[in-house]
């Protein structure tokens, strides 16, 4: 018996250790089933919200354009009508935000990041309707805003709504479903499930609490929201630019150069956004009437610009395939780029309910196409296709501004269905991110959140300072 025990002892000990490790790993994964079920519910709700919001914006825009088309032959009518309709739609969005849910202004993504750190409140009962209806107004007016910011915020708020409705008390459930809604919202906005997952894991890395529960919940929510989106809209790529040729290896240095350019552009772009936000705060000074009036003027301006040069306004998704196909000259591309930079800064910096993803992707496409056409002119021996630089530029500006290169790469590849361009995308986005970091630029959403928290603390300090001091006078008795 002693001999047998001594012979089996080393193997038995090793086997026992492996068994304990496996049991510990299995027992550690005590994922509450209710959280995973609720994650699926959050994904379905967010997907339905995304489809409704997308179709609602399209309907409002179509009705506005149809009304203008009916009076297109009457110049004395079409110009005033274009201004008035867009102004009224925009004013509705600004009014709802300023009067009922100030946290619904702007993109909304920084609000979700703040909520994940328990620094910002989540009032879903007012944010969801205000963001939905207000977004219909501002985006329907033709302002240079995107649909993805509202979808991320409404998705995150939907997650918190499910938590409150089903009375899930655990902090893990509250955090996981908030992140799930945000990821599902981005997935539903762009039909890009992997980008939705990466956005939460990479861009919100400082706020997201990594655990088996939260990762599973995010995956399930993104899957269900994507299924809902594709059930109603089909499985085609959201931006159809056709299949582009792969980039030859001897042209990769040009993509690195493009990334360097976009790194600098991203830092400057972010700085201009912050300056524009400060400028509008000085203009309205917190007075909601002035803010609504400013919003009406901006909306009316976009309505007029839509008649003059439609490519200068709108989210930009319709412009991307046209620009990537090389239908504009270099001079026209630069003109559109400058015009859209100005309109993007004005619309987003004013605090209108709407995102900046889509306008940013359009800007990257335009400048990338201009760079590609220039390279094709100076280096004809490479046989360059300008569209590949358009796709690379689309992700590069996002990577430099938001500081999430992996999300930018995957998002653009999923949206355009051009996965063969992954190598030039990596070179361009990594170069843009490194240059932006070297120049000291701050990630866009993190910087906006920091500014919001600073204003929150300042307002709190002002309230405390204005409270009357209570004097403790000694009580005397007889």
Curated annotation (Swiss-Prot):
Entry GO terms, CC: plasma membrane
Record gene name: clcA
One matching Pfam family: Voltage_CLC
Record topological domains on the Cytoplasmic side: 1-32, 117-123, 167-176, 202-214, 282-287, 439-478
Origin superkingdom: Bacteria
Protein name: H(+)/Cl(-) exchange transporter ClcA
Main location: membrane
Residue intervals on the Periplasmic side: 70-76, 233-252, 310-329, 377-386
Residues flagged as site, Mediates proton transfer from the outer aqueous phase to the interior of the protein: 148
HAMAP family with a match to the protein in the record: CLC_ClcA
Intramembrane segment boundaries: 109-116, 177-189, 193-201, 387-401, 402-404, 405-416, 417-421
Keywords from the UniProt entry: Antiport, Cell inner membrane, Cell membrane, Chloride, Ion transport, Membrane, Transmembrane, Transmembrane helix, Transport
Membrane topology annotation: Multi-pass membrane protein
Site (Mediates proton transfer from the protein to the inner aqueous phase): 203
Organism this protein belongs to: Yersinia pseudotuberculosis serotype O:1b (strain IP 31758)
Record motif Selectivity filter part_3, residues: 355-359
Family classification: Belongs to the chloride channel (TC 2.A.49) family. ClcA subfamily.
Quaternary context: Homodimer.
GO MF entries: antiporter activity; voltage-gated chloride channel activity
Reaction(s) this enzyme catalyzes, per UniProt: 2 chloride(in) + H(+)(out) = 2 chloride(out) + H(+)(in)
């Amino acid at each position: 018996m002693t001999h047998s025990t001594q012979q089996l002892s080393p193997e038995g000990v090793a086997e026992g250790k492996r068994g304990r490790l496996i049991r510990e790993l299995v027992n550690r994964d005590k994922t509450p089933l209710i959280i995973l079920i609720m994650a699926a519910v959050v994904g379905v709700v967010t997907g339905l919200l995304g489809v409704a919001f997308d179709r609602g914006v399209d309907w409002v825009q179509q009705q506005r354009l149809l009304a203008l088309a009916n009076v297109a032959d009457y110049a004395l009518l079409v110009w005033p009508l274009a201004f008035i309709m867009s102004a009224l739609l925009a004013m509705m969005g600004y009014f709802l935000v300023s009067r009922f849910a100030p946290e619904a202004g702007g993109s909304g993504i920084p609000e979700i990041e703040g909520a994940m750190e328990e620094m910002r409140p989540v009032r879903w009962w007012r944010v969801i309707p205000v963001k939905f209806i207000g977004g219909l107004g501002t985006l329907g007016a033709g302002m240079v805003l995107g649909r993805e910011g509202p979808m991320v915020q409404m998705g995150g708020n939907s997650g918190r709504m499910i938590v409150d409705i089903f009375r899930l008390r655990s902090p893990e459930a509250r955090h996981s479903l908030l992140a799930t809604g945000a990821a599902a919202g981005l997935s539903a906005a762009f039909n890009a499930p992997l980008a939705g997952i990466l956005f939460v894991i990479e861009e919100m890395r400082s706020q997201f609490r990594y655990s088996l529960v939260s990762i599973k919940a995010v995956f399930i929510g993104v899957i269900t929201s994507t299924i809902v989106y594709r059930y109603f809209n089909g499985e085609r790529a959201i931006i159809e630019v056709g299949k582009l040729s792969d980039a030859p290896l001897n042209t990769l240095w040009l993509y690195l150069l493009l990334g360097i350019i976009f790194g600098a552009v991203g830092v400057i772009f972010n700085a201009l956004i912050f300056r524009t936000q400060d400028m509008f705060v000085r203009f309205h000074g917190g007075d909601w009437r002035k803010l609504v009036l400013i919003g009406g003027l901006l909306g009316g301006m976009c309505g007029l610009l839509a008649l003059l040069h439609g490519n200068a306004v709108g989210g930009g998704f319709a412009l991307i395939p046209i620009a990537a196909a090389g239908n504009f000259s270099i001079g026209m591309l630069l003109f559109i780029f400058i015009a859209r930079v100005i309109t993007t800064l004005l619309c987003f910096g004013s605090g209108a309910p709407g995102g900046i993803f889509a306008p940013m992707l359009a800007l990257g496409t335009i400048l990338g196409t201009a760079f590609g056409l220039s390279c094709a002119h100076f280096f004809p021996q490479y046989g360059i296709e300008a569209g590949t630089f358009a796709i690379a530029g689309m992700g590069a500006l996002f990577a430099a501004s938001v500081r999430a290169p992996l999300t930018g790469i995957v998002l653009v590849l999923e949206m355009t269905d051009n996965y063969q361009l992954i190598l030039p995308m990596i070179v361009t986005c990594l170069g843009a991110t490194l240059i932006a970091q070297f120049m000291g630029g701050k990630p866009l959403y993190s910087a906006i959140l920091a500014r919001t928290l600073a204003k929150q603390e300042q307002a709190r300090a002002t309230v405390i300072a204005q409270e009357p001091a209570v004097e403790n006078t000694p009580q005397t008795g007889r």
